[in-house]
Each structure stands twice: as C-alpha cells, then as structure tokens.
Amino acid sequence: MEQERNYTNGDYKRLGRRIRKEPDNIAQEDYQMLQDLRIANKSALAATFKALHHAALKIDKDSVCTYRIKRIESIISKLIRFQDMEAQRIADIAGCRCIMTSEENVMALYEHLKKKENKLPFIIRSEKNYIESPKENGYRSIHLNVQTKEPPLKVVEIQLRSLDQHNWATLVEISDVLFQSKLKEFGDKENPDLYEFHRLLAKRDSELTLSDKKKISEISGKYQYLERIGTLFTENHLNLRAQRNKLKTSRNAPFLLISTDKEGKPELKDFSNFDDAEIAYFETFLNNPENKNIVLTHFKNTTFDKISIAYSNYFMTYNETLFRILNSIADVSVYAFNNYKIGEFKKNYKAFWFILSKWFGNKQKEVGLYNEDKNIRKSNKKKKEWTSSITSNVAKVNRIIANMCQGFSSNIWHYFMKRKRTRLEKELASKGYLFFNEKISNTQLLLCKKK
C-alpha cells in the first residue's frame, strides 16, 4: 500500500466544491483523495468492530456483525445533496452493523455497550433509537455515533437491529431495484401502494390486524410480488452459491468484494487482508463501464446464509419477510373460508398455491444444482451448510401450510377437500408434487416429490 497522504480541511473544502461543480467529470486525483479518506478509517473501524463483535457473541451466538467503509459514489452523492458538508466530516463513512436474532437481544447489546463504555475502545457521542420511536415508514433500528479513544480519533456509525428489522430494511431496497419504486429516496411519492405494503410489513406479527393482512395480500397479488422476487432470488441464490463454493471463505479470507449489476445479479470475490481488498475495490470502482453497484465488507467466521442475510439488498438471494407475506395470504384464506366469503377465499387460496408451486419447483432446481456441484464435495462444512439451508426453508413453508390447514373449520374443510381441488393444486400435482392431508386435525402435512 502506498504511504498515507495527509490532507487539510481546506483541501477537503476545495474537493467538495469541485465535485459539486462538475459531478459528472470528477478527476482521477479527486477519486484518489476520496479513497484515501476511506482507508484512513482502517484502524478505528477494526478496533470498533472487534469490540462490538465480541460483545454481540456473548449475548447472541447467532448474531451477524459486519463492517464496511462507505462507497465512493455514496460519499459523492452526500456531498452533492448537502451543499455545506465537508467530506471528512461525514459521520457514517465508517460503519458497523450488528444483526441480532431478536429485539430483546438488540436491547441487551445496546444496554451492554452503554454500561461498559469505560472498557470499550470508543465513546458514544450520540444516538438515535428508532426502535422506541420508529420512522414514519416503519423503519426500526438503533444508530450510535461513536468516537475511538485512541488516535487517530475517528467517528464510526454503529447500527443495531433485529433480524426481522434488518429483513424489512433490506426488502425496501430490493423493491426499489425490482420495481423502481424509490421508496428509500421519496417515501410514498412514487409508489403509494408499495410504500403502504412495506409500512404494514414493518409491524410486528402481533400488531398486524386482519385488515392489514388483507392489504398485504392484495398488494402482493397486484404486483405479483412473491412470484417476481422469488424468481430473482432463486437465480441469484444458485449463482452465488456456486461462486461461494469456489471461494476460500475461511478465517484467512474475511473480506468480501460484492458487485451487483442493474438486474440484481451478484458477483463475489474474497481477500485475505484489508489492503489487497481496498486496492481491488478502488480498481473495480475506476474500471466499471457497466456501472455495477460495488461494496467491500468484512465478516468473521461466517456462513453462506449469514452473508446472504447481512447483504440481501446486494445479493438478492434471501429474505425472511417473504414468509411473513405468505403467512398473511394464508391467514386471509382461512378467514374467508371460515366466514363463507367464497370469492375472497378462492382468490387468496389460489394465489397461495400458485406461489408455492413456483417455490417448490425452485427448491427442486436447487437440489439438482447441489447434486451437480463438484466443489461441494470437497467441503463437509459447505455440504452441511447447504443441506441445512434447504431443509430449514422447506420446514418453514410446511409449517405455514400446516398452520393454515389447522385454521380451517374442520368439517367444512374435510368436505371441501373431498369434493373440490383448485386448478393450481392440480397443476402442482402435474409437476410431480403430492399434497397429503389425511390427518388435518393433527396438521400432518407433507409436500414431496413423486417417485
């Protein structure tokens, strides 16, 4: 790595003026200055991450912690949007994110960081608790601006959120890519439907009313939301899984360079050390004719699923919120059936099975790829990781199906199952899947491939 360059406040003021004056014609030297600003956060970010990761694991062994340095194009965008801002004073150039499995664990980590501040390598300068006071669109998270105690004194933004809160936030960004809804930038101005859709999904499960679920089901159907996202996720998941199986992705290669094209197709490279990773990031940024979205991030002892969760807005391979949408459609189906609203029942029930016919077809495709992947045979860890992922997802969907069947009024439901099958259940059977429900009362339900 080249020797560190030093810049004055005046240098940064002049940099901001040059960028605002000609944002489409930024000089190579100015890009280099922005890159130097990024890597100047190296030691502060590493120290903050180490302490945060250690604290998070004590509270939640399944927590996911990452760090990243703000992308060059994001710094430029911020300088243009905020005319008086100086590059070196942007508070979130360096950032850590910790995703906990529950909101209770988020609050436990938050309290721990405040209580143990005297033993940590940073002090908390300011905080915003969007869990106690969510944003209007439903966003929930805790943001801490911390400053390192040891020179060079740097500010790092820490985000603490639960898995559900993270899934929601990343799904908003995925919707913006897939539907050009601009929710993150313009709220409900460009697409009121999808804004309301995500606002409702931001609620906790216990807060969702039947009316909310009906609206979620209605908007999902209008945009074929689960079908379109499901297709994209499957393609990207299989592509990324194959790439990941070729990588080292060990303790010796914790830096991941992610690039995503306009269609949401990701590419992945890994690096053993910070300097090599940053050189690759900067070279990729400068030589990017396809205008790919590029981010460099750091993980520690991670798995494919954790990578997919932490950066699902880049990878577009997986998001648990989709199961919540499917649950809403199932609940509306049950309500309509039990209350003799036949038209509403048929619409939602057919949508439910149409979505699942595609979903199980995609899972079958994934199993086929697993069987064909030569790289997977070299690693028992990757084998176990992949099979566990498939099994877990199938189990989640089967639970949704079982819970839906249990919710139907038994006598009416048995009569219905004897006398009538929807066209889409027949379509599912024609693709080779059998639907068993002999013991509905015990929710003994199975979807399997015909022999």
Give each language-model segment a name.
Residues 24-81, 266:
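Surface-exposed, low-hydrophobicity interaction/linker segments
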Residues 80-91, 257-258, 283-288:
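Short, flexible, solvent-exposed loop/turn segments with mixed acidic/basic and small polar residues
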Residues 101-105:
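Helix N-cap motif at beta-to-alpha junctions
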Residues 113, 119-148:
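Short Gly/Thr-rich strand-loop-strand
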Residues 265-274, 294-297:
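A short, exposed loop/beta-hairpin motif centered on an aromatic-Gly-Thr core
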Residues 273-289:
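A short, charged, amphipathic alpha-helix used as a generic interaction element across diverse proteins
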Residues 290-337:
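Short, mixed-charge low-complexity intrinsically disordered segments
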